[in-house]
Curated annotation (Swiss-Prot):
Its EC number is 4.6.1.-. Gene3D superfamilies: Phosphatidylinositol (PI) phosphodiesterase. The keyword Isomerase does not apply. Disulfide bonds join 45-51, 47-193. Binds 1 Mg(2+) ion per subunit. One of its GO terms (biological process) is lipid catabolic process. Keywords: Cytolysis, Dermonecrotic toxin, Disulfide bond, Hemolysis, Lipid degradation, Lipid metabolism, Lyase, Magnesium, Metal-binding, Secreted, Toxin. Mg(2+) binds at residues 25, 27, 85. The active site is at residues 5, 41. Dermonecrotic toxins cleave the phosphodiester linkage between the phosphate and headgroup of certain phospholipids (sphingolipid and lysolipid substrates), forming an alcohol (often choline) and a cyclic phosphate. This toxin acts on sphingomyelin (SM). It may also act on ceramide phosphoethanolamine (CPE), lysophosphatidylcholine (LPC) and lysophosphatidylethanolamine (LPE), but not on lysophosphatidylserine (LPS), and lysophosphatidylglycerol (LPG). It acts by transphosphatidylation, releasing exclusively cyclic phosphate products as second products. This is Dermonecrotic toxin LlSicTox-alphaIV1i. One of its GO terms (molecular function) is lyase activity.
Length: 276
């Protein structure tokens, strides 16, 4: 998966898809009560990126639904996976669970349109700290007893993006009521302004491939330097988050990688561990 980074304006969705992305990441900000407000990153952000692009969350989700609904004139088949990078740090601790429930409602009614026939992309609920596991718990439990629980079970995955200890991350999922290998993506990364080694990535990949795994997939962020892309692919990651999807596409076409990797399509399940 080539994951377009910080796609916070509606018009940027097609821009990143045109560059070769098959996945996007969008930042979501909240008020202190846990209500989602804007698609906004703010300062600091990646080098050579505009940090203040934003949309109203409802308007963005509606547009995203159009782009990922077959039969809609705006449909783009390339977009198969959306990462919601949830800026939960400003939510009051005692409102984290309710914030998760409220955002689940926005996904259900603004993105899925309260229907099984809209917004076909898979989604990842990405939270920046394992201390915020109650947000995931609230999101998941919003669907308990719901007619749309099957949508959650089919379409939704999880990620803690704060580079936390992997054993502690496993425990956080247990606290959230999410079982091992239940659609879990593990991210690792840092802003493109600063180099970062692959030590933790290698540990995550080892977990993914072990009999005692809790991780289904591994992705790195934010990567665009040619040598760093090659290093990430040689580490056997499943996804690369980038500001320059065209760079990743170019590397994938090289002799070293063209027979080892392919660009994921909608037919490739993002929750299934890939075995060579």
């Amino acid at each position: 998966w080539i994951m377009g980074h910080m796609v916070n304006k509606i018009e940027q969705i097609n821009e990143f898809l045109d560059l070769g992305a098959n996945s996007i990441e969008v930042d979501i900000t909240f008020d202190n009560l846990g209500y989602a407000e804007y698609t906004y990153h703010g300062f600091p952000c990646d080098c050579k990126r505009w940090c203040t692009n934003q949309e109203n969350v409802k308007e963005y989700l509606n547009a995203l639904s159009d782009i990922t609904t077959p039969g809609n004139p705006k449909f783009r088949k390339e977009l198969t996976l959306v990462v919601f990078d949830l800026k939960t740090g400003g939510i009051d601790a005692n409102r984290m669970y309710e914030g998760g429930k409220d955002f689940a409602g926005k996904i259900l009614f603004d993105y899925w349109k309260g229907s099984e026939n809209a917004g076909r992309a898979y989604i990842i609920i990405s939270v920046p700290s394992i201390d915020h596991y109650k947000f995931m718990k609230g999101f998941r439990e919003r669907f308990d007893g719901s007619a749309f629980k099957d949508l959650l079970l089919e379409k939704d995955g999880w990620d803690f993006s704060g580079n936390d200890d992997l054993d502690a991350t496993r425990t956080a999922y247990q606290n959230a009521g999410i079982e091992a290998l239940n659609h879990i993506w593990q991210s690792d990364g840092i802003t493109n302004c600063i180099p970062r080694g692959l030590g933790r990535v290698n540990k995550a990949v080892s977990n993914r491939d072990s009999p005692d795994a809790f991780i289904n997939k591994v992705y790195v962020w934010t990567v665009e330097k040619y040598s760093s892309v090659k290093d990430a692919l040689n580490a056997d990651v499943d996804g690369i988050m980038t500001n320059h999807p065209n760079v990743i596409n170019g590397v994938l076409k090289e002799d070293e990688f063209k027979d080892r990797f392919k660009l994921a399509t909608y037919g490739d399940n993002p929750w299934t561990k890939f075995k060579r």
